[in-house]
Design a protein with these regions (language model features):
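PLD/PLD-like phosphodiesterase catalytic module centered on the HKD motif
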Residues: 2, 12-169
């Protein structure tokens, strides 16, 4: 079983805990995060993804950063491959944050459940692979060390912002 996630903002503690538990069960998890370096053309602090990434790295989850070059990786995609069981593709407008998932923002998501050889599942898998791996002519992502932030101050700042809702993510 494999779980591939490509997301603009990841900060919801229950989502992070579920991803960590899945990895502990042996699910191969790959997470592709926006480095939160730019938000709509304005330089950012990296909160929340750079801090949340520490929890993923500590759980031995594979992580890469979208190489945004001044833009944002605005996708919100989760793809679960389950061998002979149906695949699940979740995509839409919701970030994996408390504001988005706890009904504080109006969001719309779609879950597509189909056989692993379904054309839409295949296209979603190919898009994730293209973004995860780089080629000689296409560069979409960079390794985990590029944006990792080990600052305890910013980690707890992000946790307070997520818990309180005093944030825009």
């Amino acid at each position: 079983e494999r779980l591939d996630i490509e997301i603009l903002y990841l900060s919801h503690r229950r989502v992070i805990a579920a991803v960590v538990r899945a990895a502990a069960r042996g699910v191969k998890v790959r997470v592709l995060l926006d480095p939160n370096h730019h938000a709509f053309g304005v330089s950012g602090s990296g909160i929340p993804n750079r801090q949340a990434a520490n929890d993923l790295i500590n759980a031995d989850i594979q992580l890469r950063w979208s190489d945004t070059r001044g833009a944002q990786a605005h996708g919100k995609v989760l793809l679960r491959h389950a061998g002979k069981r149906p695949a699940h593709l979740l995509l839409g407008s919701a970030n994996y944050t408390r504001r988005s998932l706890n009904d504080l923002n109006f969001e719309a998501n779609l879950e597509w459940v189909a056989d692993s050889d379904d054309e839409i599942i295949h296209e979603a898998r190919a898009a994730f692979e293209r973004h995860w791996h780089n080629t000689d002519t296409e560069h979409y992502s960079t390794g985990p060390k590029a944006y990792l932030d080990a600052s305890r101050w910013r980690y707890w700042q992000y946790r307070l912002m997520e818990a309180s809702g005093w944030c825009t993510f």
